[in-house]
Amino acid sequence: MTEQVRWIDVLPLGELWEGDLAGFDLEGEQLLVVHHLDGSVRAFQGMCPHQEVLLEDGDWNEESGVLVCSGHRWEFDLFTGDGINPDDCRLKEYPVRIDQDRILVGLEAYEKEIDADPVR
């Protein structure tokens, strides 16, 4: 199987202000979209890897980029997805692109490879 990306239109860029974040359910996957103060936009898994608490409910410091999960206070760097406390975990990151002032997030799509010379 080969992996491809399907781009999903999430929302207009102007609806997610710099220094803000929002959670979304995209085709059954919880995502967290972050619009940093420097203008960059990132997307990560929206559930804490510890106990599947929604990260959008956590405490976010938009200046440092650190999000603290409301469940058990796990901390994540929302510039990189790296775990801070504990530091042995990481949030899955999704590709993001801006197209005509709209935020698009890439979800994985799988397509079956066709064997050019099938065995009979």
Where are these regions (language model features)?
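Rieske [2Fe-2S] iron-sulfur-binding domain
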Residues: 20-120
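Basic/polar N-terminal segments that are highly enriched at the extreme N-terminus
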Residues: 1-3
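Short amphipathic
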Residues: 5-13
